[in-house]
């Protein structure tokens, strides 16, 4: 029996899935980890948490599925996009990673547009405007605000590609995820030498870029021992979380569109050609399908808003869920169902980490509007769900 593992490096946790060639799911496991916000608008994680979560979730999947390690024939990776992992000459993490929903880089976005020769020129180079969530502004932020750390940087990786590095020892990425760095020539599916030169970012700091289905390396002996797998298992390029999800949803041909919700909320459309929004309101990236592209819009705090609500106001439901052996979101959803559609005039604005689509504003903030004495917990829970959708 041939078994394949998919490892997704999410914002709230890492999920590993084991499937057969037929698509039958044998087992899954999720390991959660923290997110740090040392200042308003900042969002960081420790890359070591991703690696520990990946290793633990793989071991759990093998155990739960009763899977023989020798049956595992390949590993695919997906994950949260745009995050910046800075490594030194020894391949060690220099500081916590800045995430996709981090909003500290407004000044760096302006700097990028200026260096590129204006917003229109930038979009002409990489098909997208400079947005605070993207990777390139984070690189400039490190250079501008932590020069002592920037001087130590020898490699810059995306979240899933850091896990790839720990699995294979290879510095590698793939086109769908690399598109979200703002440093990829999306048309050519290669790093933009022109923009890198204008930003004075050394090309050797960036990894080799593969197509998503290409083998990017094989499992090292050290990683294999930790995961409980044989050495030499191929690890393919994989994809950014949205591109990988789109393939799973069948969004691989002209005219197909998906709407999905995780921490963020995304509308994703396949394209056979490069489709560029001159206004920069939506993103144009390489698809994880060779020779194809996609356009997408992203609301930063969709499911993330409901997670925030659970953490801040759902302690009773979380305790009850633990006692019952169910997911706390199940109880919160039942609670929300007690309020009518529209939450009787209570509205939630889900701008907990700024916003990206259709109004790119890192300073946007969330709010409840329309509160009255009539509103109870069911209204608040439902309003968060409605505001995020």
Report each predicted region and the residues it spans.
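N-terminal glycine/serine-rich phosphate-binding loop of ATP-dependent small-molecule kinases
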Residues: 1-95, 107, 124, 152, ...
């Amino acid at each position: 029996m041939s078994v394949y593992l998919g490892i997704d490096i999410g914002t709230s946790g890492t999920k590993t899935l084991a499937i057969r060639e037929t698509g039958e799911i044998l087992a899954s496991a999720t390991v959660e980890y923290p997110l740090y916000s040392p200042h308003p608008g900042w969002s960081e994680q420790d890359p070591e948490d991703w690696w520990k979560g990946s290793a633990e979730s793989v071991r759990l999947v093998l155990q739960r599925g009763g899977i023989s390690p020798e049956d595992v024939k390949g590993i695919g990776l997906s994950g949260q996009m745009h995050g910046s992992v800075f490594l030194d000459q020894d391949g060690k993490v220099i500081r916590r990673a800045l995430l996709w929903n981090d909003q500290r880089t407004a000044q760096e976005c302006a700097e990028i547009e200026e260096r590129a020769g204006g917003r229109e020129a930038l979009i002409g180079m990489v098909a997208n405007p400079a947005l605070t969530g993207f990777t390139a502004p984070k690189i400039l932020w490190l250079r501008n605000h932590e020069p002592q750390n920037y001087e130590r940087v020898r490699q810059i990786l995306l979240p899933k590609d850091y896990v790839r590095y720990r699995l294979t020892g290879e510095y590698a990425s793939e086109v769908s995820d690399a598109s979200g760095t703002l440093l990829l020539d999306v048309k050519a599916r290669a790093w933009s030498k022109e923009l890198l030169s204008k930003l004075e970012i050394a090309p050797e700091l960036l990894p080799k870029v593969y197509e998503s289905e290409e083998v990017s390396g094989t499992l090292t002996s050290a990683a294999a021992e930790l995961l409980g797998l044989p050495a030499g298992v191929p690890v393919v390029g994989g994809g950014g979380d949205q591109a990988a999800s789109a393939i799973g949803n069948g969004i691989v041909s002209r005219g197909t569109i998906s709407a999905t919700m995780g921490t963020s909320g995304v509308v994703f459309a396949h394209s056979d050609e490069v489709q560029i929004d001159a206004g920069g309101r939506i993103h144009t990236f390489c698809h994880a399908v060779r020779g194809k592209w996609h356009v997408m819009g992203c609301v930063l705090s969709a499911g993330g808003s409901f997670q925030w609500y659970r953490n801040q106001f759902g302690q009773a439901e979380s305790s009850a869920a633990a006692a019952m052996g169910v997911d706390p979101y199940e109880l919160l959803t039942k609670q929300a169902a007690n309020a009518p559609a529209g939450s009787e005039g209570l509205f939630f604005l889900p701008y907990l980490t700024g916003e990206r689509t259709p109004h790119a504003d890192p300073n946007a903030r969330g709010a409840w509007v329309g509160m009255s004495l009539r509103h109870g917990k069911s209204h608040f829970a439902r309003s968060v769900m409605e505001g995020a959708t």
